[in-house]
């Protein structure tokens, strides 16, 4: 599932990979509710969570450009749900469904972590090394966060409560 992004301008478009065709193909899905780039996601093609991001369409003083928005994908449509506690973009996400996820790091090199339980975000223990443009994988209770800006090789393991520094990447990079 591919959703949102900077084209430019930012898009709310959704595309699904169709494995029912011999070589596979992308098909258009329902658009998200807010066009934004630099957002994060977690889940599968039928149970996805999209959160955070940046939307130039919103500008002060009416609305901030960095978004706290969260949307859930059920395999057919996006539904707006509760916002993150801290609006940010350039963050990473981890999790295997739209009911259990992590929002990790993000703009201004923050180390914030939030957990999603299917209806609300909760503040959790921060990364040891604050950063943005990082990558992550895993579940909401066992995740790995790595790389990021400012061009770090740091890797950290999440156990559902705390982040622990583990062996670094051989080469620091940003996503």
Task: Enumerate the predicted regions with their spans.
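Polar, enzyme-active/binding microenvironments
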Residues: 1-175
């Amino acid at each position: 599932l591919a959703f949102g992004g900077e084209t430019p301008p930012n898009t709310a478009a959704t595309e699904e990979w169709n494995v029912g065709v011999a070589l596979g193909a992308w098909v258009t899905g329902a658009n998200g509710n807010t066009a934004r780039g630099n957002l994060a996601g977690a889940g599968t093609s039928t149970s996805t969570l999209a959160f955070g991001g940046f939307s130039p369409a919103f500008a002060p003083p009416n609305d901030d450009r960095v978004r706290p928005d969260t949307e859930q994908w059920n395999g057919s449509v996006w539904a707006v749900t509760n916002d993150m506690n801290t609006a940010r973009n350039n963050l990473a996400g981890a999790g295997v469904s739209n009911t259990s996820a992590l929002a990790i790091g993000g703009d201004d090199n923050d180390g914030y972590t939030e957990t999603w339980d299917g209806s609300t975000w909760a503040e959790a223990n921060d990364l040891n090394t604050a950063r943005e443009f990082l990558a992550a994988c895993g579940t909401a209770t066992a995740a790995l966060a790595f790389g990021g800006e400012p061009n770090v090789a740091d890797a950290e393991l999440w156990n559902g409560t705390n982040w622990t520094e583990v062996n670094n990447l051989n080469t620091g990079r940003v996503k």
